[in-house]
């Protein structure tokens, strides 16, 4: 939930309103929105008592799985992982695609590192930005030609979705879709998913370096 700087009382009210609006007495996956490190966590959830409340809700069964989405560097992620022993993260939402795997922009941590840290602890991941904001469905022509030569039947976007779905620690992949053909392509890619081979993963790593 994106509680921002709301008070504990207002945050609890928003949470209870969510249950009411969803017409349910429990939530399967409850997410702390957009954490970048321990400072952001403490300011919004740790020092405010909100995290203690959410843990009690999970203990009572009204939250089935509790996690967070991450946007930040490796140092920030490491600090949040240190909280796993205390809070037991059930899942973490990370940005993962074949560019960000080892070529994340700015100070953002590489997806390879993030997924490996989650795997070490047995924490499932939810994948956001599998198409890097749509960039990996609208690649330069020389990249599209390279992908089509390797797999003439697959769409350009399907390569990115297969990357996101190949890793065994992935729980689900988020996809923003605008048109029916996007939905049809996604369904075709994942029904059933054909995991990428090591050779194909190496091919995509080379492709990312060409972008």
Regions found by a protein language model. Give the residues of each.
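Glycine/proline-rich, positively charged
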Residues: 5-127, 131, 138-143, 151-152, ...
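Structured C-terminal cap/extension of enzyme domains
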Residues: 86-88, 113-211
